[in-house]
Every structure is written in structure tokens, then in C-alpha cells.
């Protein structure tokens, strides 16, 4: 607690001083929430960039089962994916969506896999008119983060689903060392 004598001494010491006028400019910063929303929107736009409707990849289709393996990956990974050795941690249901909405959802799924460090995801295409079922693999093979895809085994959706492996930063390190 401040003594009466100390307070009087302080007041005499600062007698005649004036309050400093604030003349510095403080820049306005964008709130963190808006920055993260903007960054996520940009990432989603960047991801959608990879999904061209005109691209026709050479996909392996044996017995109506669609398969894809990136060139730098061990072929045994594709066999494991087809057997169901990988358990999907994220599921995306595209039933009833338009092509544009499905493309946006695919971009969001890949971003979510990267953010949550999910290696395997399942995409439910359904049977329907088969337009999405045929287009989804064509879009996925264009994305650099997609390692492999395979028609899902029965326990993960069978003919109506696709399992996809998404590259994670640490998985690349494990392969290199």
C-alpha cells in the first residue's frame, strides 16, 4: 500500500508534466478467424484446380474395378488397398450431388485428410447413372497428393465406393529414409 508521504512526494516530482499525445499509427490486422477462413478458401480453390473434366487418364479397369497407382509407389500398396488392408478414417458420401458440388467436396476431403493426417478415405459414389462413379477416379488421379485408389472391398462399400490413399508429409519421409 502506498503511504501518504510517498504519494505526496510522487505528485511533487511529476508536477508540470503533460500527458503524451499518441501519434503512432497502429495498423489494423485481419482477425485470425478471417485469415484462417481465407487460407482455407484459397487451399480449396487450389485443390479444385487439379480436377479437370477434359483429362482422360489411363486407368486400370479389371472386371469393372477401377484402380490407380502413382508411378513412384510400390505396387504392393495397390494390392493391399484392394484387399481392404487399409481402414478408411474419413468417409465422403456423394449421393445426389451435382458434378460441380462433388468436385468441391472432393477438394474439401483431400484438404481434410491433409489437415487431420488421414491416410485412407472412402468415397461413396453410389450406383445411380454412373456419371460420378466414372468421373471421380478421373479427377482424383490428377491430384498430386493422391497415391492410389481402388474400388472398395465389400466391407467398405463394394462397387458403390472408392478407397483413396492421400500422401502425408511424414509418409514421404518414411519412404525416402
UniProtKB/Swiss-Prot annotation:
PROSITE patterns for this protein: SMR
Keywords, sorted A to Z: Endonuclease, Hydrolase, Nuclease, RNA-binding, rRNA-binding
Q: Which InterPro entries match?
A: Smr_dom, Smr_dom_sf, SmrB-like
Q: Which residues form the Smr domain?
A: 92-167
Instruction: List the residue ranges forming a coiled coil, or say none.
Output: none
According to the UniProt entry, its GO molecular function terms are: RNA endonuclease activity; rRNA binding
* Pfam families attached to this UniProt entry: Smr
Q: What is its EC number?
A: 3.1.-.-
Q: Does the keyword rRNA-binding apply?
A: yes
Q: Name one GO biological process term.
A: rescue of stalled ribosome
- Give the family this protein belongs to, as stated in its UniProt record: Belongs to the SmrB family.
NCBIfam families xrefs: PRK04946.1
* Stated role: Acts as a ribosome collision sensor. Detects stalled/collided disomes (pairs of ribosomes where the leading ribosome is stalled and a second ribosome has collided with it) and endonucleolytically cleaves mRNA at the 5' boundary of the stalled ribosome. Stalled/collided disomes form a new interface (primarily via the 30S subunits) that binds SmrB. Cleaved mRNA becomes available for tmRNA ligation, leading to ribosomal subunit dissociation and rescue of stalled ribosomes.
Which proteins does it associate with, and in what oligomeric form?
Associates with collided ribosomes, but not with correctly translating polysomes.
For this entry, the protein name equals Ribosome rescue factor SmrB
Which organism does this sequence originate in?
Answer: Haemophilus ducreyi (strain 35000HP / ATCC 700724)
Amino acid at each position: 500500500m502506498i503511504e501518504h508521504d510517498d504519494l505526496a512526494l510522487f505528485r511533487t516530482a511529476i508536477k508540470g508534466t503533460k500527458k503524451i499525445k499518441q501519434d503512432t499509427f497502429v495498423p489494423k490486422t485481419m482477425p485470425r478467424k478471417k485469415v484462417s477462413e481465407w487460407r482455407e478458401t484459397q487451399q480449396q480453390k487450389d485443390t479444385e484446380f487439379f480436377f479437370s473434366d477434359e483429362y482422360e487418364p489411363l486407368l486400370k479397369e479389371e472386371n469393372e474395378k477401377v484402380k490407380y497407382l502413382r508411378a513412384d509407389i510400390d505396387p504392393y500398396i495397390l494390392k493391399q488397398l484392394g484387399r481392404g488392408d487399409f481402414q478408411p478414417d474419413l468417409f465422403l458420401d456423394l449421393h445426389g450431388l451435382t458434378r460441380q458440388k462433388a468436385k468441391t467436396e472432393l477438394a474439401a476431403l483431400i484438404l481434410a485428410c491433409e489437415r487431420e493426417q488421414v491416410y485412407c478415405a472412402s468415397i461413396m459414389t453410389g450406383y445411380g447413372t454412373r456419371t460420378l462413379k466414372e468421373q471421380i477416379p478421373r479427377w482424383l488421379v490428377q491430384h498430386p497428393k493422391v497415391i492410389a485408389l481402388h474400388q472398395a472391398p465389400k466391407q467398405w462399400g463394394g462397387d458403390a465406393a472408392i478407397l483413396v490413399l492421400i500422401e502425408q508429409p511424414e509418409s514421404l519421409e518414411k519412404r525416402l529414409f
